[in-house]
């Protein structure tokens, strides 16, 4: 256990701090090779882990490429300018609409896309409105927070969701039927906490006339229009074709190819830049990191956690839901959500839980791994990248401020979300 744990910690350190520019793919690969050479994992574990990650990472990359193409076309800026006008000059209403826009983008384009794409747009828009740095920080923190807390409803809304759904063979419709109502509760709780926490930083009014016209944001009309069609067809495809056995990644890939072809033909978007900006490293990172995590499983960590989950399962639905959710949220905050979701899945699979109790644990693991990363900056790689993007915009957020905000905001939202899950599953008892 000590050797497997040491290799895992080394993987996290290299991935988070990236010494001398070492990419996350290389760091995970080096540590996976170390785990293999040291006997922590075996050659036979490689195809097992690949079977866990291939569909998830392929889907994630396809969704991110679609979001990057739409961003280049002006899609998200157009949407942000529209919702800003819906605020009608009232600061609190503007804050609400920005948060709801973030929730919608997170649901359709994954949490990473929501945080990284919306943040620069929101900053530019708030600067145009003449908002103070403190007010801008409130809006930016809100956009970053909702990106994760609202990434529950669909399998494609978060890489964590895809990994878990693949592991337990959850269908797209089956997953959405449980998590859509849970996500609504999460959004409502998040919106309430954000308004409460930042109540002194939200201006009473703003001048709508300072905003650009939404139409002026559209840089590639053809890709912009095609984007709407692709999004509708993707959602239909996910719900209709996935139950027929077609992988979510294949459906997403078709949508990506269609939108990419439209953008390529129009010449207004630098499609080469978009491809270079796609997170290709996540494929290598996921395989390498999960091989290292599999080493923890081989060393007995998941067996120990399975015992903890068995105790929770014996106490009923509420204990299983809240216990699993808070446990994986804590683990995500200290050891990153990507490895935690697999550790959680392996532990649940190894437990004696069954029926609705096991179902509650599966979804609570997803909730914990989606929301838990908001407690600390190291909870997800996307958060670290988001903080880096902010620093480039002269908005430095200290780890202390992030942790203080994160723990105050996350725990109540996590509680409400897990309660909503328990209520949703109790309906099917």
Curated annotation (Swiss-Prot):
It comes from the Bacteria. It is a multi-pass membrane protein. One of its GO terms (molecular function) is antimonite secondary active transmembrane transporter activity. Its main location: membrane. GO terms for cellular component: plasma membrane. The chain crosses the membrane at residues 21-41, 46-66, 98-118, 136-156, 178-198, 228-248, 249-269, 274-294, 316-336, 337-357, 371-391, 407-427. Keywords: Arsenical resistance, Cell inner membrane, Cell membrane, Membrane, Plasmid, Transmembrane, Transmembrane helix, Transport, Transposable element. It is found in: Cell inner membrane. InterPro entries: Arsenical_pump_ArsB. Disulfide bonds: none annotated. One of its GO terms (biological process) is response to arsenic-containing substance. Belongs to the ArsB family. Involved in arsenical resistance. Thought to form the channel of an arsenite pump. This is Arsenical pump membrane protein. It comes from Yersinia enterocolitica. The gene is arsB.
